[in-house]
């Protein structure tokens, strides 16, 4: 208890002050599976902004920083830097333009150039943080005529860049042919099985690695075909994932240092997602668990909700977990109604767990439930909730408890969630909007415990934990 509390105080005080070719078969899903990793999604932060805040990121206990897409992208709204503008706004822009590639080279007008990317990676290395880059080989910009000539030339002409079915809109996302070859939301589908494209794209990925990237998040991963999926008329083999994870070379080129990378895919769960087959190549997102957790947070209790299950067929060791993602916040705003305090309670639950690799989505600076875009600027740092003392505390707790088993229980009314890690420590989370006294069984030995953040005392007697919890507050208790 003393060590944890002092580590947290040190972290908070610190915050306030301030190439080998692939061969054979590789498992690039997890460079480390110690159960101590955490990811900060520095959403729309520029490379310079991430570098400038790397000290604070490391002090807050994160082991990875995930950037937004780094490749050349569509220049919309005159190159404006608003996260999301309306016709009345003087500064225009849309955050999603960087999800519309025009070439696969490093640097874009929204986040920074190649030199800024390198400086960010150098800063991360200095502080022992690893850089994950959001990559998206599945599609190009809606305006496909904006694709740069260098990309067209690299793939043998514009007509060879896309699947034969690549301009037909998906109408059934559970139809694997449509899902993996068709146009999604107006975004034309790239022929990811074209060896010329694979070679060009892999050059981009290897360039990122040479500059210091140590992992990748594959956007729209379930829209890129698996070996068992139907072939597009222009394709002879669905081998993209073999190449992207270093199992196979293309035109003599292989993924660099595949055994040292962490790779996961955005594979949103549905009726025909093929999670177990994707798991042969990449880790994946536990989107259903996030939905269940948000429901408990919205309810203010987890009664009749099982938070111990992951709602996923893949071992939780290979899942990226979240309370919310940039999609749940920005697209249909399905998580935007949750307050920062509610999101933090969810974070403590997933970060205290033994498995999964939790990702903390950084909301925009100045945002609220009534103003989701906040100060509304691309490139700026998000709000400071990523380094809240309770967040720092559970990030440290996660590292200290690595290897310990977990048990998740709730009070009878479901308002207090306990994540126990063996008999060494617990995270106690009041997800309700009321302060109240409680009693519940625990794995902690009998004794009096002082919370590491707030200094509040709790008592364990004959295996029963008791005390008073404040509304939307978390506590961390550890045995001596």
Segments (PLM) and residue ranges:
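Bacterial N-terminal signal peptides that target proteins for export
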Residues: 2-9
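Bacterial N-terminal signal peptides
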Residues: 10-17
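Active-site-proximal helices and loops of the catalytic beta/alpha 8
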Residues: 23-38, 52-58, 62, 69-70, ...
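Aromatic- and acidic-residue-enriched carbohydrate-binding clefts of CAZyme catalytic domains
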Residues: 33-37, 73-119, 157-191
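Active-site mouth loops of central-metabolism enzymes
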Residues: 39-48, 187-199
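Active-site-proximal N-terminal segment of extracellular/periplasmic enzymes that hydrolyze or transfer
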Residues: 45, 56-60, 144
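Eukaryotic low-complexity intrinsically disordered regions
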Residues: 146-148
């Amino acid at each position: 208890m003393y060590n944890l509390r002092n580590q947290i105080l040190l972290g908070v005080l610190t915050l306030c002050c301030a190439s080998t070719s692939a061969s054979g078969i590789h498992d690039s899903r997890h460079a480390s599976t110690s159960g101590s990793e955490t990811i900060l999604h520095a959403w729309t932060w520029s490379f310079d902004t991430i570098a400038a805040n790397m000290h604070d990121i490391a002090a807050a206990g994160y082991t990875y920083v995930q950037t937004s897409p780094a490749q050349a992208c569509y220049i919309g709204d005159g190159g404006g830097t608003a996260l999301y503008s309306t016709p009345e706004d003087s500064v225009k822009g849309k955050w999603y333009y960087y999800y519309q590639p025009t070439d696969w080279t490093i640097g874009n007008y929204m986040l920074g150039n190649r030199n800024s990317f390198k400086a960010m990676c150098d800063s991360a290395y200095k502080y022992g943080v690893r850089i994950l880059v959001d990559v998206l080989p599945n599609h190009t910009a809606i305006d496909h005529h904006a694709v740069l000539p260098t990309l067209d030339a690299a793939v043998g002409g514009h007509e060879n860049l896309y699947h034969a079915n690549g301009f037909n809109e998906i109408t059934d996302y559970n139809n694997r042919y449509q899902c993996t070859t068709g146009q999604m939301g107006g975004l034309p589908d790239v022929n990811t099985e074209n060896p010329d494209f694979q070679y060009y794209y892999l050059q981009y990925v290897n360039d990122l690695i040479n500059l210091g990237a140590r992992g990748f998040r594959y956007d729209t991963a379930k829209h890129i075909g698996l070996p068992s999926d139907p072939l597009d008329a222009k394709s002879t083999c669905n081998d993209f994932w073999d190449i992207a994870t270093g199992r196979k070379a293309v035109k003599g080129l292989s993924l660099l240092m595949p055994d040292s990378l962490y790779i996961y895919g955005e594979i949103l769960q549905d009726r025909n997602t093929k999670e177990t087959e994707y798991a042969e190549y990449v880790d994946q997102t536990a989107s259903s668990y996030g939905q269940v957790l948000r429901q408990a947070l919205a309810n203010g209790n987890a009664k009749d909700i099982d938070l111990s299950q992951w709602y996923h067929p893949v071992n939780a060791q290979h899942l990226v977990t979240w309370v919310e993602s940039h999609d749940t916040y920005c697209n249909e705003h399905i998580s935007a109604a949750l307050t920062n305090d509610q999101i933090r309670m969810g974070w403590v639950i997933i970060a205290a767990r033994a498995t999964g690799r939790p990702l903390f989505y950084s909301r925009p600076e100045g945002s609220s439930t009534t103003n989701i875009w906040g100060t509304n600027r691309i490139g700026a740092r998000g709000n400071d909730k990523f380094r809240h003392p309770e967040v720092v505390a559970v990030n440290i707790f996660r590292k200290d408890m690595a290897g310990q088993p977990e048990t998740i229980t709730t009070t009878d009314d479901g308002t207090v969630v306990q994540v126990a890690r063996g008999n060494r420590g617990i995270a106690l989370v009041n997800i309700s909007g009321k302060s109240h006294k409680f009693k519940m069984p625990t794995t902690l030995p009998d004794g009096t415990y002082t919370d590491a953040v707030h200094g509040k005392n709790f008592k364990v007697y004959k295996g029963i934990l008791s005390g008073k919890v404040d509304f939307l507050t978390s506590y961390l208790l550890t045995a001596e």
